[in-house]
From Swiss-Prot:
It is an enzyme of class 3 (hydrolase). Catalyzes the cleavage of 5-oxoproline to form L-glutamate coupled to the hydrolysis of ATP to ADP and inorganic phosphate. This is 5-oxoprolinase subunit A 3. GO terms for molecular function: 5-oxoprolinase (ATP-hydrolyzing) activity; ATP binding. The lineage of its organism: Bacteria, Pseudomonadati, Pseudomonadota, Gammaproteobacteria, Pseudomonadales. Keywords: ATP-binding, Hydrolase, Nucleotide-binding. Belongs to the LamB/PxpA family. HAMAP family: PxpA.
């Protein structure tokens, strides 16, 4: 349980294969999560991959999130691009609609939006970009939630979301190191991504219980989150997901 008394959810980025290139183990990971963030074609995912990922989520009763990104297939969406707010609004709306077409064809719908990679990180501290993404969510469907990074202080995000009339979901990461303000440690830093399964489990359980855990510098950090993410592109992702699912279910 998080400090609101609600059960914390478990999410994973999926549907990230592209053509002959394979990423992650969606078939075995999907039954272990509550929410699946599905790539929409800009950083990964092609139409067939998207359809299959939606089918898999529907089969296992998993909530589907659109995972829009900058148009950056070669960089897997992890490079910031010099896009205007108008461009970001359009590309996010485009990607939500693409994934939702597959959802609707299978009797479901996109339940939330979680930006990917560099776009996700760029929203932190950039009000113009955050407004563009919030407005895209609001334009697509009233009440469509946006998943954002849980920070030590999310006051600004809450203020802008309230102006746009968009619900927020706050996300924390089990397998990433954090800076003191709650931002993710950049991947270029050594130790920014946790690979030790025990450390991942310990950090996840601390967040789920509303307890402090060590930030990148070893100082205590406390975050309030609705959902925990484990990345599907780590070598030990499936084994960690299984252990984490069991640990969260025991709380």
């Amino acid at each position: 349980m998080n400090d609101t008394g609600r059960r914390i959810l478990l999410n994973c980025d999926m549907g990230e294969s592209f053509g002959a290139w394979r990423m992650g183990d969606d078939v075995h990971s999907m039954p272990l999560v509550d929410q699946a963030n599905l790539a929409c074609g800009f950083h990964a995912g092609d139409p067939l991959t998207m359809r299959r990922a939606v089918e898999l989520a529907v089969r296992h009763g998993v909530s589907i999130g659109a995972h829009p990104a900058y148009p950056d297939l070669s960089g897997f969406g992890r490079r910031s691009l010099a896009c205007s707010a108008e461009e970001v609004h359009a590309m996010v709306l485009y990607q939500i609609g693409a994934l939702d077409a597959f959802c609707r064809s299978l009797g479901t719908q996109v339940a939330y939006v979680k930006p990917h990679g560099a776009l996700y990180n760029d929203l932190v501290g950039d009000d113009e970009l955050l407004r563009a993404v919030l407005d895209a969510c609001a334009a697509y469907r009233k009440g469509l939630p946006l998943m954002v990074l849980a920070l030590a202080d999310n006051g600004r995000e809450l203020e802008l979301a309230d102006e746009a009339d968009v619900p927020l979901l706050f996300e924390a990461f089990a397998d990433r190191a954090y800076l003191p303000d709650g931002r993710l440690a950049p991947r270029r830093l050594g130790g920014a991504v946790h690979h030790d399964p025990q450390r991942i489990i310990e950090q996840a359980l601390a967040i789920a219980r509303g307890e402090a855990f060590p930030d990148y510098d070893g100082n205590p950090l406390r975050l309030t989150a609705d959902s925990l993410c484990v990345h599907g592109d780590n070598p030990q992702s499936l084994a960690v997901l299984r252990r984490l699912r069991a640990a969260l279910d025991s709380l």
